[in-house]
A protein has these predicted regions:
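Short alpha-helices
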Residues: 99, 175-218, 226-238, 437, ...
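Short, ordered loop/turn segments at secondary-structure junctions
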Residues: 88-89, 116-119, 146-147, 162, ...
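Structural motif
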Residues: 40, 144, 363-366, 634, ...
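C-terminal helicase lobe
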Residues: 228, 702, 719-720, 724-725, ...
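Conserved motor-coupling elements within RecA-like helicase/translocase cores
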Residues: 675, 681-726
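Active-site cavity-forming subdomains of large catalytic enzyme subunits
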Residues: 131-220, 245
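Hydrophobic helix-and-loop "lid/oligomerization" segment in the mid-to-C-terminal part
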Residues: 2, 13-139, 160, 209-437, ...
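Acidic, two-metal ion nucleic-acid-processing modules in DNA metabolism proteins
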Residues: 249-292, 296-346, 381, 401-645, ...
């Protein structure tokens, strides 16, 4: 959706550009990828390499008590006793159950499963579950994805003669069940982020090893029997929204490989029902296509349909179950929509103090308890505040809570637990149950707690950006798309990279899809274009066509019919600064100090006049670069200058941009340093016509993010000031070797970025024509002077010399023209009149070639053009 407010709903963390350069060089990464890694905390080459390789792995034996647990389980498995896997009704619980059932059966155990009914049984191991296990004659129950909080239930099971092993990953309470526990935190496992299926996989691996059925050598390398279950581990890891970092990255990557190469019968059928191509399946398909269908059965019907699907080898049976899950998912969407609509009505009926509070607690009768959790997530997306939805059934209300970053749901429920019958969950998601007569008191207490923990800023959805890019070199294109893809799998803890295209434009917008809600377009940034799409935004996209915008996008590899191409997916549109843009009006972009005060202007005029008279026109071109260290040079030519500048500004390091004429480049600077983007100040601009106050202000290194823009004249006038900036970005090529050297001089280390291309070269050549090929300027000045015998001085003379253009001539150009006029005996310079005066001696036509200075200026012109062209070839 579009954002047009004054506060920008995104942020990009500052970083050390040196770290980015090291990663890019040593790991051969495009700079936006290196920036993304550094911003995400992978700041060293070793840390980034480990992340990219995703090889982290730990042995199951690193769970304390694993050997004891395996001995206990195998003792039952080798006998006649029944083992029951007690799971849960979501994807993580279903897949964990399937992993252990299949493993134990392969080891010869009599093994079945028990998945509680969400509606009638509730979550986890309950007293009703214990009674059911007794009736089955279960000798050993292994909980998966539950049990860590079931202290009383475990005790009851053991009292009934049932052995218990708890495997779980949920947050443990103060008291643990009195039985063997396999849990990433409780058992001291090196990686605490495993989901329940990950824990079950580790247990299954340990069981096979203990039973002598571990790793074997195959033609394709070492294989473990439980490698076949990595597809289920990947599915659960993504679906349960555990962080996709550390060992989870390896598990999901390897699981996706299993899904692509040899999917099990049940998942092959489910992928067909969900229209997912196994060859291109990714974490997004797991999260948004497969997981909802498995969860739908647990929300509405029988969760063990998912277990049966994972275990069956019968294609016909798998297809039937997959079709059942697909139908359930359609019904789930309908039920979810009804709950969301009912919740919005309930919110509207609340008094403003509750409807607009930092959290929402909403209740209603007839809300399907199986979908209140996902409906709560929808309300969080809309209103961006912690939300609890409760389904009322008689005197009891059951529901789910979903949170926003920075608000701990478990802590909030702990603080209000006196009103609850039971609750549990994570920081971001929880379930709860209470008596209806405590609902109002609970709502008041929960809202009070939320108000004490959250402020207004917390309830603004903050989009965290990874990098700022344009179209072209190191920007949007196939190479970057492929490199960004290598950062996957994406999900919780490792979201897909979000890029910002600063000051981009949407061109050639066309509707997409049968209902026209979507759109395709060409995204323009700098001189480059890339194809893109936006989903559900066609109206907004169409209204904003051709407008300069900041666009939050994802860049993906679009695969279709064996072909690949980069595709931009727009997620958010942000309006640029809507204050009046005064760039392009010559005298205004630099502020009050432009043009220079009289004394300064005439001093520069006199200096150049003397240089021309000595046969050395353009003395500023020859300012000597100071001795000392030189900056590292970064070649950004062929990229988008606005994006390059904006990215460097976002780093928080000082940035100086140098161009041919800062007044003409003011619009570019404003686009790169929009003050609402990162809280940066407006760009500080000083052009070749400015006075020293403006120039000194522009070249003062800022304390925070910001941009200074000067032209090569400013660099020549203040050569030492350039050295204090961390980054110097060369927007237009330097007109001389001396000025080129100044751009690389440094006292703080740093970088010189070459950001010019053919267009900038052409502009520089045109401006050099204006500055050195004086015929047109002389003719214009001549027409503005009095008739022969007259004089011009002071303000009128300066006006004649500057001209009426939005971009007045500099004192140096004016001085060259006056020197030529004097050498041709058309004028006489009268230096004794204070600011100077010019007497007109003749109005006769003459040949400019008679002037020695005119020839010297032409020679200087050709010298600078040759230098520019040589640099263009370098």
């Amino acid at each position: 959706m579009a954002s047009t407010g004054s506060a920008r709903a995104f942020q990009a963390d500052p970083y050390d550009y040196g770290e980015v350069r090291r990663l890019a060089a040593e790991l051969e990464l495009a700079e936006p990828v290196a920036v993304t890694l550094v911003r995400r905390g992978y700041r060293t080459v070793d840390a980034a390499r480990r992340f990219l390789e995703a090889r982290e792995s730990h042995e199951p034996s690193e769970f304390r008590g694993m050997e004891e647990v395996c001995d206990r389980i195998l003792a039952v498995a080798r006998g006649p006793g029944r083992i029951t896997i007690h799971g849960d009704y979501d994807v993580d619980g279903v897949t964990s159950t399937a992993i252990l059932v299949s493993t134990l059966r392969s080891l010869g155990a009599e093994c079945d499963w028990l998945i509680p009914d969400r509606l009638s049984d509730g979550y986890g191991l309950t007293m009703a579950s214990v009674e059911q296990l007794q009736r089955r004659g279960t000798e050993l129950v292994i909980t998966v994805d539950c049990g860590i909080g079931s202290v009383e239930e475990v005790a009851a099971a053991q009292a009934a003669g049932i052995q218990v092993v708890v495997t779980d990953h949920h947050l443990p309470g103060e008291q643990l069940p009195d039985c063997p526990v396999i849990h990433p935190v409780v058992s001291g496992y090196p990686f605490e982020g495993l989901c329940a299926a990950g824990v079950a996989h580790k247990l299954a691996t340990a069981l096979c090893d203990a039973a002598g059925q571990g790793t074997v050598e195959t033609v394709s390398g070492k294989r473990h029997p439980t490698d076949r279950d990595l597809d289920l581990v990947a599915l659960a890891t993504v679906a349960d929204m555990v962080p996709l970092v550390g060992e989870n990255r390896r598990l999901v990557r390897e699981g996706l490989r299993v899904l692509r190469d040899s999917p099990r019968t049940g998942l092959r059928a489910l992928m067909a029902a969900a229209s997912v191509d196994p060859q291109t399946i990714d974490a997004g398909a797991l999260s948004f296509r497969l997981a909802p269908r498995i969860n739908a059965a647990g929300r509405l019907y029988r969760a063990d349909a998912g277990v049966e699907l994972m275990l069956t080898d019968d294609p016909d049976r798998a297809a039937a179950i997959a079709a059942e899950l697909d139908r359930a998912n359609g019904e789930r969407r309908s039920a979810e929509r009804k709950v969301v609509e009912g919740a919005e009505r309930a919110r509207s009926a609340l008094p403003p103090s509750q409807a607009d509070a930092p959290a929402l607690v909403l209740a209603g009768e007839g809300w399907h308890p199986g979908v209140v959790g996902i409906a709560a997530s929808r309300l969080v997306e809309r209103h961006f505040r912690p939300t609890i939805l409760l389904s009322v059934d008689g005197a009891r209300a059951k529901g789910s809570a979903r949170s926003i970053p920075g608000f701990d749901l478990v802590a909030a429920l702990d603080a209000t637990s006196e009103h609850l019958v039971r609750y549990g969950g994570h920081r971001a998601a929880a379930g709860l149950e209470l008596d209806v007569d405590r609902l109002d008191a609970f709502r008041d207490a929960f809202l009070e707690h939320a108000a004490s923990e959250l402020d207004t800023a917390d309830m603004v959805r903050m989009e965290r950006l990874d990098a700022l890019v344009g179209v072209g070199r190191d920007g949007i294109g196939m190479d970057l798309a492929r490199q960004l893809e290598s950062l996957g799998p994406f999900g919780m803890g490792n979201p897909g990279p979000r890029l910002l295209v600063p000051s981009g434009r949407l061109r050639e917008v066309r509707p997409l899809g049968e209902d026209g809600k979507h759109s395709r377009f060409q995204l323009e940034s700098g001189a480059g274009r890339a194809g893109g799409v936006a989903f559900g935004m066609n109206g907004e996209i169409t209204r904003r066509e051709d407008e300069a915008l900041d666009l939050s996008v994802e860049l993906e590899v679009d695969r279709w019919n064996g072909a690949e191409q980069p595709r931009v997916v727009v997620r958010e549109l942000y309006a640029l600064d809507d204050e009046p843009d005064e760039s392009g009006r010559g005298r205004r972009p630099c502020g009050d100090g432009c043009p220079a005060p009289e004394v300064e202007w005439w001093a520069r005029f006199d200096r150049e006049l003397a240089s021309v008279a000595d046969g050395r026109p353009g003395a500023l071109l020859n300012v000597r670069a100071p001795d000392g260290p030189r900056r590292e040079q970064v070649d950004r030519r062929g990229g988008a200058a606005v994006a390059s500048l904006a990215e460097l500004i976002s780093s928080g390091e000082s940035v100086l941009a140098i161009c041919a004429d800062a007044a003409r480049r003011a619009k570019l600077a404003s686009a790169a340093a929009d003050p609402r983007r990162f809280g940066a100040a407006r760009p500080r601009i000083a052009c070749c016509r400015c006075g020293s106050a403006s120039l000194d202000a522009a070249l003062t290194v800022p304390s925070g993010a910001g941009l200074a823009l000067v032209d090569w004249t400013g660099v020549a006038l203040r050569p030492d000031a350039v050295r204090s900036f961390r980054h110097v970005v060369v927007i237009d090529p330097p007109p001389s070797e001396a000025l080129e050297g100044l751009a690389r001089a440094t006292e703080v280390g740093g970088y010189t970025h070459l950001a010019w291309g053919p267009g900038e070269l052409r502009l520089s050549e045109r401006l050099l024509d204006r500055e050195w090929e004086l015929r047109g300027a002389i003719a214009e000045i001549w027409r503005a002077l009095p008739e022969a015998g007259g004089e011009a001085e002071g303000g009128p003379l300066r006006s004649a010399l500057e001209g009426a253009s939005d971009y007045p001539r500099t004192p140096e150009t004016a001085a060259r023209c006056v020197r030529v006029l004097c050498e041709l005996d058309l004028c006489e310079w009268l230096p004794d009149r204070g600011t100077g005066a010019l007497g007109v001696l003749s109005s006769e036509r003459t040949d400019l070639g008679r002037s020695r200075s005119y020839g010297a200026c032409l020679a200087r012109h050709q010298e600078t053009i040759r230098f520019l062209q040589a640099r263009a070839q370098a």
